Amino acid sequence: MRLYRDEAVVVRQHKLGEADRIVTLLTRQHGLVRAVAKGVRRTRSRFGARLEPFSYIDVQLHPGRNLDTVTQVHTVESFAADIIDDYGRYTTACAILETAERLAGEERAPAPKLHALTASALRAIAAKQRPHELVLDAYLLRAMRFAGWAPALDECAKCATPGPHRAFHVAAGGAVCVHCRPPGAATPAPGVLDHLVALARGEWAGIEAVPESTRKQASGLVAAHLQWHLERQLRTLPLIERSGPARDAATAGHAG
């Protein structure tokens, strides 16, 4: 079979035998790819450091029956140094990679939009110009849109009546009007849903001035909505600090 080349975000890796690793890549053209990187754990490996998570690489692979094999790799951008030196940025970036892997779907199913979004999110976290938790929430909202799970924010999830609305219910699909509001719906504080709309649209002007309590409650709703659709909790999200109001809102939205 012919070699192929692609650009990829390194999502994760784990040991294989004494000297090899299996790397999980989110590629631009081929979606999620798992490949063996032979000998990378040896001191003299040609490209071991280039296959660390948070790297953006140009990689050449040889197709295999179950796993491909990395034959060449060049670093395009390395975000790791500017991410791992801060716990908040590190856990946020880990949550982005875990989400990307979960949303990418079947292996080799092209996901160019998710690939580009993931690379952009890591780049933004490494740049340190915006709060990492806001980058994460914007990423999750847009990634869910690509998956077809975007929460309704400025119209009722049930009847499509234009908002603004005051209630949010995860199982209903997001914001709900007074007529469609199911039992157990959360009532976010004023400004929370507007904040989520701005994040989803990438309207960054003024976002950082939003009160911390509003931002944290919005984060809780985003996390609850994502994990309800995934039908399981992401391992990395609990490592990112959430305030009491965010957890309360997420729990209420999940009920019923």
From Swiss-Prot:
Q: Does the keyword Calcium apply?
A: no
Q: Which SUPFAM superfamilies match?
A: ArfGap/RecO-like zinc finger (SSF57863), Nucleic acid-binding proteins (SSF50249)
Upper lineage ranks? Answer: Bacteria, Bacillati, Actinomycetota, Actinomycetes, Mycobacteriales
Name the NCBIfam families on file.
reco
| Family, similarity comment | Belongs to the RecO family.
Q: What does this protein do?
A: Involved in DNA repair and RecF pathway recombination.
Has the keyword Repressor been applied to this entry?
A: no
A single GO CC term for this protein reads: bacterial nucleoid
Q: Which PANTHER family match?
A: DNA REPAIR PROTEIN RECO
A Gene Ontology annotation in the biological process aspect, one of them, is: DNA recombination
Signal sequence: where?
A: none
Which keywords does this Swiss-Prot/TrEMBL entry list?
Answer: DNA damage, DNA recombination, DNA repair
The molecule here is called DNA repair protein RecO
